[in-house]
Design a protein with these regions (language model features):
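Carbohydrate-associated surface elements
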Residues: 147, 168
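Conserved donor-binding/catalytic core segment of Leloir-type glycosyltransferases
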Residues: 175-193, 199-207, 211
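Short His-centered aromatic/hydrophobic patch
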Residues: 75-76, 93-100, 116
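Nucleotide-activated donor-binding/catalytic signature segment of Leloir-type glycosyltransferases, i.e.
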Residues: 221-245
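Acidic donor-binding loop of glycosyltransferase active sites
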Residues: 248-263, 276
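N-terminal strand-loop element at the rim of the active site
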Residues: 6-74, 99, 148, 215-219
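Conserved acidic donor-binding segment of nucleotide-sugar-dependent glycosyltransferases
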Residues: 292-293, 297-304, 313-318
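Glycosyltransferase donor-sugar binding loop
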Residues: 209-222, 237
């Protein structure tokens, strides 16, 4: 079976790579169609081919500048045309990069699957009719959680087209150097990530240190002011894998006080894959692996005091911490890329 895996904007290059490699190991012929990753080197293909057919100019001329957006919009139809020329038994889109354009321009040329990583992406979440029209063009829609399934069913997506494929963990074995009191806030820094709640929870937790490791896509001054007087280390920018491993190796526990705008968190699954327990708000599907495997604590959304209490417990109770670490290891053993590949191949067979 020839699978055309597509992430036009290279939003999730590590996810794309792991899924493509696992599909190839399972016997599929896989081409990953994407664009140049603007923040570093993309993983080298393993058993699949990778082609950069989207945004050849905007992805190279601009990194963060908003000047790239008009050029990207102009290039988008050319990328879709190039995609249509690629042969496929199944077309699997990881993201709809420009939904306002895609609703007019995107027509699948093969049986199509869409993975709703963010369910309804934040910028266009209020445009329910636009998303109903777009999602109707896919034979199957993959979500990462039961809550994700419920959300899209409530939007009007027929339940027969929805499939839950849990997001695998990203396994790693960083050198463990945690001091028993380090709380990691990890990943891109955006308003929906809840960094202010993480800062306040660490302050209330008592003898704790906060490590903020990630790429800021919003001003940091309010966060620095909120953290005044707190023991905080800031490691900012897009972190290469050795720096990611260093941060995960120093973390006693990771914190995810997200807003209810996404289905799953790659940062959380990196933490679990490294054996680091998580404390998370009960939003979207973020809490599902933590709760299912006992890999940390889940608290009500927006309850900073409950967040602080969960951190305090894991940092002060060695037995509770070890049990949560064992849960993270169970998640790593079960939420594998090979299992996800098998689940995807089953749904591909349904529509090919």
């Amino acid at each position: 079976m020839r699978v055309l895996l597509t992430d036009p904007s290279a939003f999730t290059p590590t996810y794309d790579h792991e899924l493509a490699a696992a599909l190839a190991r399972a016997g599929a012929e896989v081409e990953l169609v994407t664009s140049r990753f603007r923040f570093g080197d993309a993983p080298a293909p393993e058993g699949y081919t990778r082609s950069e057919r989207f945004y050849p100019l905007s992805s190279r001329l601009f990194r963060r500048s908003r000047l790239r957006l008009p050029l990207k919009a102009a290039e988008h139809p050319l990328g879709l045309a190039a995609l249509r020329r690629r042969p496929a038994d199944v077309l699997h889109l990881q993201w709809l990069a420009a939904p306002e354009l895609d609703v007019h321009l995107f027509r699948p040329h093969a049986p199509a699957v869409f993975t709703a990583h963010d369910l309804l992406p934040r910028r266009t979440a209020r445009k329910a009719d636009l998303w109903r029209r777009l999602l109707a063009r896919f034979e199957r829609i993959v979500v990462h959680s039961e809550r994700g399934r419920e959300t899209l069913a409530a939007l009007g997506v027929d339940s027969s087209r929805l499939r839950v494929v849990p997001h695998p963990v990203f396994p790693s074995d960083p050198e463990r150097r945690d001091d028993g009191r380090t709380v990691l806030s990890f990943g891109v820094i955006r308003p929906y990530k809840g960094l202010r709640d993480a800062i306040e929870a660490v302050r209330r937790a008592g003898d704790a240190r906060l490590l903020v490791a990630g790429d800021p896509l919003e001003p940091l001054e309010p966060y620095r002011a909120a953290a005044d007087g707190l023991e905080v280390e800031w490691r900012l920018g897009y972190l290469p894998q050795p720096e990611v491993d260093r941060a995960l190796g120093e973390a006693t526990v990771a914190v995810f006080p997200y807003r209810p705008e996404l289905d799953q968190s790659g940062a959380l699954l990196r933490a679990l894959g490294a054996g680091v327990p998580a404390v998370a708000y009960d939003v979207g599907g973020v809490a599902e692996p933590v709760r299912r495997f006992g890999a940390g604590r889940v608290v009500p959304p927006g309850d900073v005091e409950a967040l602080a209490a969960a951190l305090r417990e894991l940092l002060s109770d060695r037995e509770a911490l070890e049990q949560a670490r064992a849960g993270a290891r169970r998640a790593r053993e079960e939420l594998t890329w090979d299992a996800a590949a098998r689940a995807h191949l089953e749904l591909y067979e349904e529509i090919a």
